[in-house]
């Protein structure tokens, strides 16, 4: 039986800016400094892990919290806020019990009760076929109303979902509207099975392919081109026997290479997959992928030589010092028909310590020019001595937003202030413009001086300055991922968000 706690553990991931928010509500007419262009009309959705109750696991990681979804409605130069928890099975049962019931991260053997679905729905939120989908890669999505943020329930695509898991990073084809997805550990914890599937814009499954990974390990993100799908395997491995003994789901494996699984996007069979190999390293989020003129695959992603998830060390307990971890935007180029599966050294696109890469999604799966991401550059002037007491811990620190131009190799940097750190950006296309990268970048910013959150809006034509700063009267915990949805895609009911 789990211990009932009356307060959150005295740990960095539950203190300072990371102290759980536990807030639901609406705020209209947020304060705006500067000017929001009236042509911007849509909703910025994002989700943060935000435990409603103290966990009974003392050192619970920050991203094991309940999914709390935020909707920022922007229209007519104004901004409003709405936030609701995803009513998962976990959330509802713990609310009724008035105590935590979920045990260690992705370890059902440590739970206080048996769950049908353990999802926290806390990693990403995307809009598809009229529904908002709250995603966690160990389970099916939860569907939410995009206006009210009311939870509709667990969503299996009307009984079509073939796997027990669904990626938190589905890819959308900007030409066909197709959603390309997969699930790993797709037959349950500790299984090597990967299930790949394509979904039509109206929600019909068009193809299902089962394949077997060379190791039971994490596949957090993936990449899609016109004709191929790529699965980067992170060398964090699962051992079901370790889990049964109360251990962690994941353990860093220095002996395991980075695998890139490559399979045809259409008409594939499981045995068609090729597992290309690179030295032991940590592949992060993908920026984009496409096919060059020779038919080679070009895959741009974050890469670190060290274990980015340092809180899950190797079998001997070895883990890197967090401040020593450096992730760079790199480019792998490979021939999908090659017999030699050894990957060449990737090209470093940007030397800086970066992550959370976003592009103009209208150019996804195709050759592209512009990439936007979080960057940590200590030389910019962040006052770490001042903000350190309020930082909390357990989450990645980035102090600026960057725009990298693939054509010129040049980088522009926006520095939000010496007491600020940034979260993942999203790109907003300029209305009626078809030019790649013509629009705005929007990101949530942590202000450690005021202990409140802000939205910073940058015009890509003047990237180094904020066109508008939208201030919240509350603090939002560091989140994971989100998306921008055009108001025309949601419909006229979006005025209810104002």
From Swiss-Prot:
One of its GO terms (biological process) is carotene catabolic process. The keyword Phosphoprotein does not apply. Belongs to the carotenoid oxygenase family. This is Resveratrol cleavage oxygenase 1. Dioxygenase that cleaves the interphenyl C-alpha-C-beta double bond of resveratrol to yield 3,5-dihydroxybenzaldehyde and 4-hydroxybenzaldehyde. Also cleaves piceatannol, a compound that differs from resveratrol only in the occurrence of an additional hydroxyl group, which leads to the production of 3,4-dihydroxybenzaldehyde and 3,5-hydroxybenzaldehyde. GO terms for molecular function: carotenoid dioxygenase activity; metal ion binding. Signal peptide: none annotated. It comes from Aspergillus fumigatus (strain ATCC MYA-4609 / CBS 101355 / FGSC A1100 / Af293). The keyword Iron applies. PANTHER family: BETA-CAROTENE DIOXYGENASE, CAROTENOID 9,10(9',10')-CLEAVAGE DIOXYGENASE 1. Trans-resveratrol binds at residues 105, 136, 355. InterPro entries: Carotenoid_Oase. The lineage of its organism: Eukaryota, Fungi, Dikarya, Ascomycota, Pezizomycotina. The gene is rco1. Its cofactor is Fe(2+). Fe cation binds at residues 169, 220, 285, 481.
């Amino acid at each position: 039986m789990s211990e009932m706690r009356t307060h959150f553990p005295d740990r960095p991931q539950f203190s300072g800016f990371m102290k759980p928010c536990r807030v639901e509500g609406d705020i209209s007419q947020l304060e705006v400094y500067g000017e929001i262009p009236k042509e911007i009309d849509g909703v910025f959705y994002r989700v943060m892990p935000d435990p409603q109750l103290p966990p009974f696991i003392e050192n619970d990681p920050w991203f094991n919290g309940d999914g709390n979804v935020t909707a920022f409605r922007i229209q007519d130069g104004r901004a409003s806020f709405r936030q609701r928890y995803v009513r998962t099975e976990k959330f509802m049962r713990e609310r009724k019990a008035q105590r935590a019931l979920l045990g260690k991260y992705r370890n059902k053997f440590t739970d206080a009760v048996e769950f049908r679905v353990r999802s926290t729905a806390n990693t990403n939120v995307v809009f598809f076929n009229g529904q908002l989908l709250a995603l966690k890669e160990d389970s099916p999505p939860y569907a939410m109303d995009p206006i009210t943020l009311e939870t509709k329930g667990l969503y299996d695509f009307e009984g079509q979902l073939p796997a027990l898991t669904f990626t938190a990073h589905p890819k959308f084809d900007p030409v066909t509207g197709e959603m390309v997805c997969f699930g790993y550990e797709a037959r349950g914890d500790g299984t090597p099975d990967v299930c790949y599937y394509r979904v039509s814009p109206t929600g019909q499954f068009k193809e299902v392919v089962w394949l077997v990974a060379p190791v039971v390990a994490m596949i957090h993100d993936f990449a899609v081109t016109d004709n191929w799908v790529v699965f980067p395997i992170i060398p964090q491995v699962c051992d079901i026997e370790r889990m049964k003994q109360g251990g962690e789901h994941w353990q860093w494996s220095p002996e395991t290479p980075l695998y890139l699984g490559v399979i045809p996007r259409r008409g594939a069979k499981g045995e068609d997959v090729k597992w290309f190999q690179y030295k032991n390293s940590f592949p992060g989020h993908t920026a984009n992928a496409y096919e060059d003129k020779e038919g080679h695959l070009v895959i741009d992603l974050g890469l670190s030589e060290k274990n980015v998830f340092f809180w899950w060390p190797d079998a001997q307990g070895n883990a890197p010092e967090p401040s020593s971890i450096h992730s760079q935007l790199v480019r792998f180029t490979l021939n999908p028909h090659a017999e030699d599966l050894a990957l060449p050294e990737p090209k470093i696109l940007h030397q800086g310590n970066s992550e959370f890469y976003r592009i103009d999604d209208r150019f996804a799966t195709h050759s592209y020019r512009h990439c936007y991401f979080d960057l940590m550059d200590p030389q910019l002037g962040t006052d770490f001595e001042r903000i350190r007491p309020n930082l909390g811990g357990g989450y990645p620190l980035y102090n600026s937003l960057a725009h990298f131009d693939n054509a010129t190799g040049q980088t522009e940097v926006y520095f939000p202030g010496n007491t600020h750190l940034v979260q993942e950006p999203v790109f907003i296309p300029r209305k009626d413009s078809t030019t790649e990268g013509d629009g705005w970048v929007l990101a949530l910013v942590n202000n450690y001086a005021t202990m409140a959150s802000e939205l910073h809006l940058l015009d890509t034509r003047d990237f180094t300055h904020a066109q508008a700063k939208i201030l919240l009267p509350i603090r939002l915990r560091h989140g994971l991922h989100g998306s921008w949805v055009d108001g025309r895609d949601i419909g006229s009911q979006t005025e209810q968000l104002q």
